[in-house]
């Protein structure tokens, strides 16, 4: 089941983020950099703000939280961003990521395009987005919490 995240879900989201990040980025981002980011981006205060200002969805499997997705609302230009989509490793490949993605897309009927930024080495995510119609626009180098990364920018056309 996919539903909106509530304040009661904050601890579960923090746990999903921690486990998913360790699994996803184990060979891409050093552990200390991951922890630094998780402490900031997934603090209770930050998650509460994200719940108020964004589309924040939870995936449940047999009534247990196992994944989440976070989208910005469509801006005045018709653009939105998928800022996070994570599913616990044991629950990947069963369609929950797809359900989270399409549930978020339903929330932006008047949008023009949805952007997502993916670490270039995150092949699983790249395959996932390309499977559902995202197109890679560019790749660029940047620093993430002081750590050099190569990032791929993808776009999905919302009204084509």
Label each PLM-derived region with a short phrase.
Residues 4-10, 14-92, 101-107, 140-142, ...:
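Acetyl-CoA-dependent GNAT
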Residues 95:
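Conserved G/P- and acidic residue-centered "switch" motifs that form tight phosphate/ATP-binding loops
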Residues 98:
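Residues forming the Rossmann-fold NAD(P)(H) cofactor-binding site
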Residues 101, 108-118:
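Conserved GNAT acetyl-CoA-binding A-motif
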Residues 103, 127-128:
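Structural preference for long, well-ordered alpha-helical segments within the folded cores
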Residues 115-126, 143-148:
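Conserved beta-strand-loop-alpha-helix junction that forms the acyl-donor binding cleft
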Residues 128-129, 134:
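Conserved active-site tyrosine of GNAT-family acetyltransferases
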Residues 149-154:
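Short hydrophobic/aromatic beta-strand or adjacent loop that forms the aromatic wall/cage
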């Amino acid at each position: 089941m996919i539903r909106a995240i509530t304040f009661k879900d904050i601890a579960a989201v923090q746990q999903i983020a921690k486990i998913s990040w360790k699994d996803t980025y184990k060979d891409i981002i050093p552990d200390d950099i991951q922890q630094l980011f998780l402490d900031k981006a997934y603090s209770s205060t930050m998650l509460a703000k994200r719940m108020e200002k964004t589309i924040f969805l939870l995936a449940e499997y047999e009534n247990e939280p196992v994944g989440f997705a976070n989208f910005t609302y469509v801006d005045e230009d018709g653009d939105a961003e998928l800022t996070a989509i994570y599913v616990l490793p044991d629950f990947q490949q069963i369609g929950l990521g797809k359900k989270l993605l399409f549930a978020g897309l339903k929330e932006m009927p008047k949008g023009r395009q949805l952007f997502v930024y993916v670490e270039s080495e995150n092949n699983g995510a790249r395959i996932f987005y390309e499977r559902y119609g995202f197109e890679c626009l560019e790749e660029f180098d940047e620093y993430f919490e002081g750590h050099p990364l190569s990032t791929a920018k993808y776009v999905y056309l919302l009204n084509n």
